[in-house]
Structure formats: structure tokens, C-alpha cells
Amino acid sequence: MNRIINIKGRICAVFATKIIFITLIGISNFTFAQSGPLVSSYGVWDRGFEHNLKTYPFIRGASSDCPWDNIEKKSGVYDWSSMDVAVEKAYKNKMSVYLSFEAGPKTPDWVYEEGVPKVTTNDQMHDKFPYYPYYLSPIYKKLYTRFITEAAKHIHSYPIEKQAKIAFIQVKTGCTGDETPYKGESNDKNYDLPKEGADWQNFRTECFALYAKLFDQIEPKISLLFGSISADEDGGKDRKYQQQWDWVTKNIRGVLGIKAGALSRGSHFADEKTIVNTWQKYLIDPKGLKFFARSEMDQSWQRPVFQLNVQLNFYWAAINALNLGQSIWDVSSGAMEASKEEGFDYSFFFFDKYAGQIYPKTANNAFCALHKGLDYSDKVVYPEAEFGLASQKNIERAEKITAAFAKYGAAIDDKSALTMGQVKQRGNQAGFNDAGWKIWSDNYSRLLYQINPDETCIPIWRVNGPLTPRSSIYDRFARGFEHVSGKDAMYFKLHEGFSQDAKPKVMSINVVWYDGVEGSKWKLDYDAGAKTMKTAINITGKGDKKWHHEAVTIKDAVFRYGGIKGSDLALINTDDKDDIFSIVEVKRGEKDVPALLPQDENHAFSGHNKGTKYGKGENADEGDIQKKDKKGDKVKKNKNE
């Protein structure tokens, strides 16, 4: 059996795409074929073009903000040089870029001189936002419309090959991308605009219509990304935005973009299940409406719970986001630069590998990461009569449920965090919790699913005991055999369409398992189209207490649910000893040689376990405010020039 060898860098192939278009300005005889961001652009993105692709080969794209006060410093005089440079760099480096045109507090001062009211607020945390425009002013609307219209004209003046590098445009209608008019409340009640109020929501819809007219309802289309249109990144609490949801789903003709930030910032935070149930159906093998999702890794990785084991947390954050169907992971400079030194760049390569696996018939890879979350909101699995009233504030209920799984390693390290919202959790939580309110309870998957996991195997947490900065990324969650209870097999099936047909084909399987018992035996069986499953590999453990990767290529895989319980694959216990598994991966074709693997050992680094909680300007309602002028996220000289 050949062990997979380690590799620290692998660049996904970039799809060659021929783009034909009709230009917005002037006469053209072409048609444009692109619909939505290229799948090859899905993966980790840089915030700006700050990092060399040779040093950070996992980068798939970069953002470029074009604030109004930088572009139009004088009325009617436009300086598009910053956007031109960004598009040129994307083209030159064979990557993608997304654009945004921030107004709000980035409105140029001359606009106020034209008669737009200047709004100050009672906010004391955002010194960089001293005032805002009154968005409902007819003068503001006229000038803002002119600015966005001129931006569209300039974008569509680019050559077709450069336009193709613009993956999408983020629609920003208010203050930053938060889709709120102001930070705080207006000091003059005449200009008050509650975020959920009809006036502000109507203004947002007007802006949506403007962007749609300029970028979506003409050729060439450029996809649009919206925030706060239904279930936002705070766990689906913004259903009040029904007006926006109805408008975009009825009027946007291209692929829709959404912000879905929570899941890529950690795992086991409140309301994960709400987010996944809301968006996953639009992101993975969608039928009807099609979406792509972008999220940010802000400063959450420097917070207490994340700093307990940065490598482990980045890995499970990537897994969590991929389970949702997230397309783009926008990573801060500090995290980008620390990734190589601190050993978590593997998570970025892993995310790149799977982010574009959207449609099963064309996907090349699938995974199932074994996991169980104890969702104490679930009254069916955990009846109130046995465990107590189902309320997020009922910590005793969470403790009772966790106690039922304590023999498998389940624990709660920070009880106080259970009652927090997910934004506050990622800022202030100080320990790992295996129970949570509406956390994701099943395995994390992308196109590969386990059949009846709780009936056929056991969940396992903290495989080698209490989690430390040196714990393996795989120690966090796992599943295993329990021979004494008859749980000796795990069955898996691929998403319908992945196999394509019933003909034998070449497929490669990778299984990550923990060698905990000397002499333990298990095997990997698969559906080869016969009446009984065929064995791909037999493994005997050495008991070295380490995680191992077993990779095998099979030449006659049929994978049409012909195995036991309708499975394509099965991990089978072949003795009375129990084995533990972390993840199963399927690849279309031959296995990768060399393969992508994490570092052999997880090492504590200088400053670990010293994450800081929220401070001024970083409250539990808003989450992390980006401070790019702070150490670790400085804007550096462009290295891609």
C-alpha cells in the first residue's frame, strides 16, 4: 500500500474559457456567453492585490474597492486608474477580481455642497465615519445614479478578455457592505433611517434596480452580489428583508451572489443549521435559482477560541463553509501571511480543491468529513421530557445532552458562550463546545454522504483527549466503529449524477483514519456493479497513535448505489477491534501524486492561546470592523506588479 506523500503547494488548473460579448458602448457583432463567476475562480481570494501568487499559489482572485470619494473628487471628473490597475492585474496574473463602489460615508464632500444634507450620528465607535449623506435626498439619488452609470460605462469599455476577469460586483447601498445607512442613529430625527424601515428598504431596492439595469439586464452581464436580502450571515435573522428577496429573485437574470460569512469563521456557532438550510439548495447542484456565496475571514481567527489551535480551526472553518456550498473565501492579509508560518495554508488549498465542485456531473472531487454536533434546539432527537425545555438559555439542557455522549469525548468548555449569538461567540468564546444552539448536527459533506450514520457507527470528539495547540486537525471530530454494539460499518453514497452512468470507470479514494490499536483490521469496499461489493484495500493497524491517509485507485468503479444499503462505498470492520475515521474523499480518475496533505505535526506557535475579545469598534452586534492599518493587516506594496 503506497502512502500519500506530503505537499505544501498545488495550483488548481484554470479553465480556459472563450468569452464573446455585446459591448454596452458602441457597436458590436458578438454575443456574451458567461453566466456567473467562472467556477475556476472559486476558492480563496486576496483583499487587494497584495500577495505574490508564487508565494501564495492558492489565491484565485482579489477584491478592488472603488469608493466614490476616490473616483470622483470633483463633480463630473472621474479617475478610474485604481480600477484599471486592478483589472489589468487580474488579467496579467490570470486570476479574477470583484469590484465594489462604496458611497455612504465615502461620498465626496462636493456632493454636500450641491445641497445633500450631511448626517451625523450618536455613534462613538467609528471615528473614520464622521458623517453620512441623507440617502433620500433627490440630489443625492441623482448624483449617485450618475456615478454608478459612469462606472458601468467604463467597465464595459474594457476589452472582452479583461471584462471576463470581473467575477462580480458587490452592491453596496449604504455604510460599507453592512447594508445599513448609518452607524448609530441620526442626531437629527428628520434624517433618521432605521435599517429595517420602509424608507431605507425602498431606497435599497431602487439601488438594486439601478445595478441590475447597468450590469445584469444588458450584455455582457456581470454578476451581482447582494447583502441582507433574506437570511444573512448572522444566522437567518434578517427574514424581514422579504422585499429585497422578492425583488432580486424575480428581476435578476444572472447568477445571484450572497454574503454568507459566519461558517467560514469557525464551527459550532449558533444558527449554523439555519444558514445551511436556507442557502445550500441554491449553492450545490441547484435546481432553479442559482447562487454563489462569498464570505470573509476577518479578524475572527485572532479571537480566543480560534487561537486555541489555529490550524485545527482553519481546517474546520473551511470544511464548514464547503458544506454550505461557499464559493469564495475572502481572506485578510494577516491570515494570508501567517498561513505558511503557522501551518494552516493547507486549509486554503483544501478549500480551493472543493469550492468549485458544484455540479455532480462535472465535479472531479467529493468528500464527507465525519462529524456530529449536539444541537440542543432539536426537540425530536432530544425530547424535552428527558432533557428539559428547548431554549437557548437553558444551559442545563445542553449539559444533559452532552453528558449522554461524554464517553465518546463530548464536552462543553465554555458554558457562557452557549447563550450568545454567533457573532459574539466568535469574538468572546474561550473554549470548544460540542453542543450548541442550532449548530450543524450531521457530517460535513460536498457531494458525498454517509447513510444512516448514527445507526451504523458512533460519533467521537477530541480523539486524543483535551484539545491543545498541538492537537491534530483531525482530532476535533470523527466517527468510529463500536463492535460491542454491532456498529461495524459505515456506508457512503455519491450525489446523484457524480457517477454519470453505470459503466466501469476510474475513481480514487482517500480515507483518513486513526491508527489507535495494534492489529486492528478494516477494509474499504465499493460498488463495482456486481451483486456483492468488491474490496479495494485491506488495512491492518500498527497502533502508532497517529492519523494516516490511505489512497487507492480503482479501475472498475460503477458507483450506482449497488452496495449494501444503496451505498457506493463502505468502511467495514473485519475484527473485534474498533477503528476511527475522519474523512473520506473521492476523486474522479487517478489519485494525485504527490498528494495534498497537511503538515505532519501541529506545532504551537508564538502567541497562541492569546486571542483578544471584542474591543471598541468591534461589538457583538456588528462583529469585526476591519482595521487594515493595524499590525498584521497592513496594506503592503503590491507584489504582483
Question: Where are the predicted features?
Answer:
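Glycan-recognition and processing domains
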Residues: 388-497, 594-614
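N-terminal substrate-binding region of glycoside hydrolase catalytic domains
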Residues: 34-135, 292, 298-305, 326-336, ...
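Substrate-binding cleft/loops of secretory-pathway carbohydrate-active enzymes
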Residues: 170, 175-181, 192-196, 202-289
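Extracellular carbohydrate recognition and processing domains
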Residues: 531-563
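An active-site-proximal structural segment forming one wall of the substrate-binding cleft
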Residues: 91, 128-170, 203, 207-210
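Short, surface-exposed beta-strand/strand-loop-strand elements in extracellular ectodomains
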Residues: 519-532
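Substrate-binding cleft of secreted/luminal carbohydrate-active enzymes
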Residues: 102, 253-434
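Extracellular beta-strand ligand-recognition surfaces/modules
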Residues: 550-582
